[in-house]
């Protein structure tokens, strides 16, 4: 098996946090459930939806703003309001089968919740978890961030 790529990730939502922050740092919403993973973004890449490429970091809680260089083992693709949105799955060691199941289960649930939130916010479009796509594929579909990027083109 080839060595997974390493990426720099900045933590936006520490594991256990109820505050959902966007890549620009603003609070998007307060969740009724804590985030089960450290969630952040790869500041060097823009995802297909026009925002920083998302990343989940498995393991112990990391503080808000932590910057970590870590292996991207896989990726999950979500569709949010009809836009593809890859999430790199990162950890020091290869995720266990149990962790992989938990990640996929979370994103299936998250897609349903985000769909309801988008209905309430009157933001149309399909919401779903499409499943695994691979870290290399997610990185290939992303584009390098340049100085012209100042935030996502749409509100999330």
List each model region and its residues:
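Hydrophobic N-terminal alpha-helices or hydrophobic patches in metabolic proteins across all domains
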Residues: 1-156
């Amino acid at each position: 098996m080839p060595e997974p790529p390493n990426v720099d990730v900045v933590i936006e939502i520490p594991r256990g946090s109820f505050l959902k922050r966007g890549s620009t740092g603003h609070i998007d919403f307060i969740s009724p459930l804590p985030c089960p993973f450290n969630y952040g973004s790869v500041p060097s890449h823009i995802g297909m939806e026009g925002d920083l490429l998302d990343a989940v970091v498995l393991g112990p809680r990391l503080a808000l703003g932590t910057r970590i260089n870590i292996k991207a083992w896989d990726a999950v693709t979500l569709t949010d309001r009809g836009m593809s949105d890859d999430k790199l799955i990162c950890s020091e060691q290869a995720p266990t089968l149990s962790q992989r199941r938990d990640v996929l289960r979370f994103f299936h649930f998250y897609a349903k919740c985000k769909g309801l939130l988008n209905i309430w916010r009157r933001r149309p479009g399909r919401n779903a978890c499409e499943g695994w796509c691979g870290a290399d594929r997610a990185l290939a579909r992303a584009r390098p961030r340049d100085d012209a990027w100042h935030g996502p083109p749409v509100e999330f």
